[in-house]
């Protein structure tokens, strides 16, 4: 929640999540991606390799397809994070138009916000820093 812009109204609604993530874990959210309209979003953690990566996929939500890879690499002074997202908006041609006009730009804005928050909290990635 802390790494998502406030205007998204992002809230985890699944109670009592375990400390450790596991494949098959279902997480429910409420999010307001457009015009403050709340919608449910349900994702499943489909793969986890502890301290290396995890993948979440949408089961219910705003996209036809949402596949989000979170990669982690230890560094001397922290952790390098990389997100790889594959998505498809709903509504065929109309969704493709909305993607070109709004959705893609919004996603870039959201992940830029996330990157800025993480850099403020943990420091800026130095590509010359060696990975462990």
Language-model regions: role of each:
Residues 1-23:
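Hydrophobic ligand-binding cavity/cleft-lining segments
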Residues 11-15, 27-28, 67-69:
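Short structured motifs
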Residues 12-18, 119-132:
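Short, highly charged C-terminal tails/helix-capping segments
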Residues 18-22, 46-53, 71-80:
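A short, structured loop/turn motif at beta-sheet edges
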Residues 25-33, 55-61:
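Short beta-strand segments that buttress and anchor functional surface loops
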Residues 33-39, 89-93:
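Short, cysteine-centered beta-strand-loop-beta hairpins and adjacent loop/turn segments enriched
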Residues 58-109, 129:
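Beta-strand/loop substructures that line and gate deep hydrophobic ligand-binding cavities in soluble
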Residues 114:
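Substrate/cofactor-recognition hotspot
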């Amino acid at each position: 929640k802390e790494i998502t812009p406030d205007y998204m109204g992002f809230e985890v609604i699944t109670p009592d999540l375990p400390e450790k993530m596991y494949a098959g874990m279902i997480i429910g959210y409420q999010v307001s991606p457009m015009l403050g309209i709340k919608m449910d979003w349900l994702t499943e953690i489909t793969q986890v390799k502890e301290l290396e990566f995890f993948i979440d996929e949408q089961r219910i939500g705003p996209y036809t397809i949402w596949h989000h890879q979170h990669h982690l690499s230890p560094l001397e002074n922290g952790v390098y994070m990389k997100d790889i997202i594959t998505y498809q908006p709903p509504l065929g041609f109309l969704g493709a138009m909305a993607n070109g006009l709004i959705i893609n730009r919004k996603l870039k804005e959201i992940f830029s916000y996330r990157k800025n928050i993480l850099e403020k909290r943990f420091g800026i990635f130095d590509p010359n820093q060696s990975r462990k």
